[in-house]
A protein has these predicted regions:
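Donor nucleotide-sugar binding/catalytic pocket of nucleotide-sugar-dependent glycosyltransferases
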Residues: 39, 53-56, 138, 142-195
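Aromatic "clamp/platform" in nucleotide-sugar-dependent glycosyltransferases that forms part
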Residues: 294
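A conserved mid-protein helix/loop that constitutes part of the nucleotide-sugar donor-binding site
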Residues: 19, 211-234, 250-256
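Short hydrophobic beta-strand element within catalytic cores of glycosyltransferases
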Residues: 311-314
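Conserved acidic donor-binding segment of nucleotide-sugar-dependent glycosyltransferases
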Residues: 325-337, 345-351
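Nucleotide-activated donor-binding/catalytic signature segment of Leloir-type glycosyltransferases, i.e.
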Residues: 254-274
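N-terminal subdomain of nucleotide-sugar transferases
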Residues: 1-56, 397-400
Length: 400
């Protein structure tokens, strides 16, 4: 099958969307499909490399840290459109709602092929970056998503939470839930009797045998990492675990300041940004994966943590229903008391920790990269059968 993937983000950027799209790309290639990618370059220079089209872009940091948009005049539209039309994609799978989505629409118009779109970002959780009024921001996100759905044959939701939200928005195309997969060959429990774990903990100044809570991902306000620091401060000092943040982002200075304010510098570590191939070993540094975020759409880090054998202790969120099950592979908590109770239960019961570890591995096995790719391919076939690229929908093309 000839498949065009369109995403505003790609390596060397590190985030959940990039990991998801690149995993899909490599899985589709491994299955023998003809796959090309259009994405944004990290500068104003448009170029092609190994079947990937990089569109020149400019920074939009004032909107949100790390965001880029296609640069005016950077698109070699006629040359690339002619080339893609000659190639003839059977389906286009968009991963972003902005620059590459609009370019994908131009290709779809020429090739008369369906567009499948994965809705990775719950924009309701990001309205503070664009609007003074939260209500106005939510209304705008809903209306914009509904308009965008008119240019798609099918939308993919990474979780039931996102699917329910899209249905609440009354989007005009069918929505299918396809959880993001993980590479189980990369993520898994340690195979070296804990030697690497002990070494990495020693480098962080963490004594052997102490409990480590691990959070991995972008440090941004909407991820609510500050609550994790406050929850740690509320634990009894004599039995207080360590908290390790792996990742970087705009919220890091505030988190470091909060850590100092609460006198927790002796119990909190900031590992910073790590290379993608080093992510699995950092998960294994922890004993429990923790999160206070309610802005997740994929739950990718939860799956990865469980694939490394970590039980999950996370803020209750509909996106985790059926994934994190209380007492089976972790706990979902709603307040400080529930967090403290679950944490104490895990720490104080060695036999339970072993069971949680085994159940976490079993849960992660359901989200293999191979299963993920097959579900996406099934969605492509559904979109082709619908054959629903609407030629009368044209106004969005004027945005390019």
């Amino acid at each position: 099958m000839k498949i065009l993937l369109a995403s505003d983000t790609w390596s060397p950027m590190v985030n959940g969307v990039v990991r998801s799209v690149e995993l899909l790309y490599h899985q589709l290639l491994a299955l023998g499909h003809d796959v090309r990618v259009v994405t944004l370059a990290q500068n104003g220079h448009s170029h092609e490399e190994n079947g990937i089209l990089y569109v020149g872009s400019i920074s939009a940091e004032r909107v949100y840290p790390g965001v880029r948009i296609s640069a005016a005049g950077a698109l070699p539209i006629s040359h690339w459109l002619d080339e893609l039309e000659a190639w003839g994609p059977e389906v286009i799978h968009t991963q972003s709602e902005f620059s590459t989505f609009m370019l994908a629409q131009r290709v779809a118009r020429r090739c008369h092929c369906p567009v499948v779109h994965t809705y990775h970002t719950v924009y309701e959780d990001y309205t503070q970056y664009l609007f003074f009024s939260e209500r106005l921001g939510r209304m705008t996100a809903e209306k914009a998503t509904r308009i965008l759905s008119g240019y798609c044959s099918l939308m993919l939701a990474p979780t039931e939470k996102v699917r329910a939200m899209l249905n609440r928005y009354k989007v005009s195309c069918p929505v299918v839930t396809v959880p993001t997969g993980i590479d189980l060959t990369a993520f898994g429990p340690a195979k070296d009797n804990g030697e690497e774990k002990a070494r990495m903990r020693a480098e962080l100044g963490i004594p052997e045998g102490d409990t480590v809570l691990l959070s991995l991902g972008r440090l941004a306000a909407e991820k609510n990492h500050a609550q994790l620091v406050r929850l740690l401060a509320a634990q009894p000092e004599q039995s207080r675990p360590w908290l390790v943040f792996v990742g970087d982002g705009p919220a890091r200075p505030d988190l470091e300041a909060l850590t100092k304010e609460l006198k927790l510098t002796d119990r909190v570590r900031f590992a910073g940004m790590v290379k993608p191939d080093e992510v699995p070993r950092w998960y294994r540094v922890g004993d429990i994966f923790v999160s206070a975020s309610q802005s997740e759409t994929q739950g990718l880090t939860y799956f990865e943590g469980m694939a490394c054998g970590l039980p999950v202790l996370c803020r209750a969120d509909p996106c985790l229903d059926g994934v994190v099950e209380n007492g089976f592979n972790g706990w979902q908590w709603k307040d400080e008391a529930e967090f403290a109770s679950a944490l104490n239960t895990i720490i104080s019961d060695p036999a339970l920790r072993v069971q949680l570890h085994q159940n976490a591995l079993a849960t992660a096995a359901r989200y293999s990269a191979e299963h993920f790719a097959q579900q996406v391919l099934d969605a492509y076939q559904q979109a082709v059968a619908l054959k629903q690229y609407e030629p009368e929908h044209r106004s969005i093309l004027s945005w390019v």
